[in-house]
Structure formats: C-alpha cells, structure tokens
Amino acid sequence: MRLGSAILGLLLLQGYSSQPTTTQTSQEILQKSSQVSLVSNQPVTPRSSTMDKQSLSLPDLMSFQPQKHTLGPGTGTPERSSSSSSSSSSRRGEASLDATPSPETTSLQTKKMTILLTILPTPTSESVLTVAAFGVISFIVILVVVVIILVSVVSLRFKCRKNKESEDPQKPGSSGLSESCSTANGEKDSITLISMRNINVNNSKGSMSAEKIL
C-alpha cells in the first residue's frame, strides 16, 4: 500500500510540472502566427530608386503577377521573391530599350549614307561610251594579232613544202642510183643473150657430131 501511494504521488507531481511548459509553448505558437498574419497583410512596395532608374515595358507589366510570400525555415521572415522579380523585369525593360534605336542614331546613319552617296561618282553616259569604245578596240586588236599569227604559220608550212619538193630531184645520190640500175639491167640482158648463143652453138655442134658418127 505504501508503494502504491508513493507511485501515485510521483505521477501527480509530474503532471503538475508538465502543465506550465505546455501552456508556454502554446502561447509562443500563437504569437508567431499573429506575427506571420501581420507580415502577410502588409503591402509590398518596391524601392523608389530602382523604379526611377529602370522603366518597365508593356509586355513585362502584362506578364507581372503578384507572388505569394513564403516563410523561411524557422526564421519567420518572408523571402526576397519580390526583389528578384522586380530585378528580372527591370533587366527585360533595359533589353527592350537597347533593342529600339534612338532617333539620334538613325539620323547619324542617314547622314553617313548621304555623305557616301555624294562621294561616290555617279556613272554618266560619257563614261559608259568610253568604256564601251575601249572594249571594242581591245577586241579588234586581239583579233588582228590572232590573224597575223595564223597567216605566218601557214606561210611557213608552205615554204617548207616547197623546199622539200625542190630538194628531192636535185639529190646527188639519186642520179647515181638510177644510172647504176640502168647499167645493171643492160648487163643482165647481155648475159642472157650470150648464154643463149652459147646454148645454140653447143646444140649445133652436137648435131654435127651425131651426123658424122652415123
């Protein structure tokens, strides 16, 4: 019995000690939630210096949407999402301003083009005629040179043929060869005649000896 009463007393003491801690934690949670609601209700206003220096373009304003504020882990303060969105939109505005040319640059470009056109000479009818005449004269000169070269080549060939024809009958070896050929032919004829005579003589002698024997 004494043990049971002692255990009950300890349990009661532990219950009384745990009650103030739970009340303290609940009060802290309520304070934090009230702070979060106050922060979320406050409107977010961008800095005036950034808005003055950087202008937003129409498509950026149309695409701009309010973002919800999120709480950081265990800090109770909103993250800087609005500042990042404003910086990205300002960058887009700068890019659009850079892409559109200013009137000063366009006027400078037009002035440069006019100066270049005034410096460059415009082609006139006289210059065109001189160029055409020069081209025709050069073409005629080239044709004359080609004709002269062809005539000289043909004349040289004709002269070479004439020289060859004139040199062929006047060769010293050709006359000697013709004479030797004629003498050789005559000797052959004489040899054949002599041999025929000898044969006839021999035949006549043989016939005479045969008659004597008979």
UniProtKB/Swiss-Prot annotation:
Instruction: Briefly state the modifications made to the protein after translation.
Output: May be heavily O-glycosylated.
* Annotated localization: Cell membrane; Cytoplasm
First and last residue of the signal peptide: 1-18
In-chain residues carrying the UniProt-annotated modification Phosphoserine: S204, S207
Q: Does the keyword Phosphoprotein apply?
A: yes
Task: Give the Polar residues compositional bias ranges.
Answer: 28-57, 172-184
The Low complexity compositionally biased stretches are: 80-90
Q: Does the keyword Transmembrane apply?
A: yes
Function field? Regulates endothelial chemotaxis and tube formation. Has a role in angiogenesis and apoptosis via modulation of the actin cytoskeleton and facilitation of proteasomal degradation of the apoptosis inhibitors BIRC3/IAP1 and BIRC2/IAP2.
| Family classification | Belongs to the ECSCR family.
**How does it associate, per the subunit comment?**
Interacts with FLNA. Interacts with the 20S proteasome subunit PSMA7.
Q: What name does the UniProt record give this protein?
A: Endothelial cell-specific chemotaxis regulator
Protein's organism: Mus musculus
Q: List the gene name.
A: Ecscr
